[in-house]
Swiss-Prot record:
<feature type="transmembrane region" description="Helical">
    <location>
        <begin position="387"/>
        <end position="407"/>
    </location>
</feature>
<feature type="transmembrane region" description="Helical">
    <location>
        <begin position="12"/>
        <end position="32"/>
    </location>
</feature>
<feature type="transmembrane region" description="Helical">
    <location>
        <begin position="169"/>
        <end position="189"/>
    </location>
</feature>
<dbReference type="InterPro" id="IPR001851">
    <property type="entry name" value="ABC_transp_permease"/>
</dbReference>
<feature type="transmembrane region" description="Helical">
    <location>
        <begin position="260"/>
        <end position="280"/>
    </location>
</feature>
<dbReference type="GO" id="GO:0042941">
    <property type="term" value="P:D-alanine transmembrane transport"/>
</dbReference>
<dbReference type="InterPro" id="IPR043428">
    <property type="entry name" value="LivM-like"/>
</dbReference>
<feature type="transmembrane region" description="Helical">
    <location>
        <begin position="94"/>
        <end position="114"/>
    </location>
</feature>
<comment type="function">
    <text>Component of the high affinity leucine, isoleucine, valine, transport system (LIV-I), which is operative without Na(+) and is specific for alanine and threonine, in addition to branched-chain amino acids.</text>
</comment>
<keyword id="KW-0472">Membrane</keyword>
<feature type="transmembrane region" description="Helical">
    <location>
        <begin position="36"/>
        <end position="56"/>
    </location>
</feature>
<dbReference type="InterPro" id="IPR021807">
    <property type="entry name" value="LivHM_N"/>
</dbReference>
<feature type="transmembrane region" description="Helical">
    <location>
        <begin position="351"/>
        <end position="371"/>
    </location>
</feature>
<keyword id="KW-0997">Cell inner membrane</keyword>
<dbReference type="GO" id="GO:0015803">
    <property type="term" value="P:branched-chain amino acid transport"/>
</dbReference>
<feature type="transmembrane region" description="Helical">
    <location>
        <begin position="311"/>
        <end position="331"/>
    </location>
</feature>
<dbReference type="Pfam" id="PF11862">
    <property type="entry name" value="DUF3382"/>
</dbReference>
Amino acid sequence: MSQSLKRALFSALLVILVSYPILGLKLRTVGIKLEVLGADAQTLWTIAAAALAMFVWQLFRDRIPLKLGRGVGYKVNGSGLKNFLSLPSTQRWAVLALVVVAFVWPFFASRGAVDIATLILIYVMLGIGLNIVVGLAGLLDLGYVGFYAVGAYTYALLAEYAGFGFWTALPIAGMMAALFGFLLGFPVLRLRGDYLAIVTLGFGEIIRILLRNMTEITGGPNGIGSIPKPTLFGLTFERRAPEGMQTFHEFFGIAYNTNYKVILLYVVALLLVLLALFVINRLMRMPIGRAWEALREDEVACRALGLNPTIVKLSAFTIGASFAGFAGSFFAARQGLVTPESFTFIESAMILAIVVLGGMGSQLGVILAAVVMVLLQEMRGFNEYRMLIFGLTMIVMMIWRPQGLLPMQRPHLELKP
């Protein structure tokens, strides 16, 4: 099978897998349960047409510029379109357009769709953080959910015992998770491979068990509830404001609507993800980012270049853990309740699957994989087969596309005859 045909089939399948859960499946409330409704014929035809168009485009995209060039009477390089899309100005405008669409979209979408999108953004931030450790530094971390729990409980405890708000506790949660990453790094980062993975797995379980057994502080299995939501310049989005505060709808003189709270959570999550992407991309261009990549490729060569592998690993663990702390703090604010059972090994496995499925080191791959994984998780009608579908998907990916959906583009040279 030719490379173009493989690429076309994979792209068409990806369009179907992403489009059908978003456009085809609908949720209907029946009593206290949610029912999943299938797609109608028109939606199925639309998805099929989009998949067919993607298949044709990927199959003939290298030949189309040449045909167009001959038709109008001048020579066009087959890589011209690719070069145009790779121009910095083109990429900047494309990214700006996507950001604008992302900010405007929740005002026209349903509440359920916005809520799921917010959950996707949480996993995107977790994937970005773990991508530093696994994708860039090449360290297998199976206990990343422990830092996620530290961030969530930091905000919950600060709100419960000190009355801190979300915006005050957010940086503290990130720093606390980074501190735990730093403390974990010293005793374990001299380990490699499977030994490092086992120790990090134990760390995640230790954190969860401690949170469950420290009943007087953390509430034990019942967790901590009544965690306040984020505010907008001191305006709360609840129906009634606490003493000394004012509600959003009263300040602007509009009717109360619960959708305002959902949209605010989405916007806050989107801002955190955009900030995380900006920081990661800056770090990747700095010496510390180059050191992570050198460590991933060859630790012995990294040491030969004068770099201290322990310090490089420690920086990756610390910075990666801070992003989990930010995500955990926002998760606590969104849920309003945190319990130890929210931070099991399954969460670590899902975050790691997002990084591997998307392509280790690839930011766009993490975003796409988070969308696919969360949508798969939300398919309640297939709940019994969810883990089976998840396992089959990972097996197919390892066989067919082991580098991930959107692998990281690394600088390289090609010698052509």
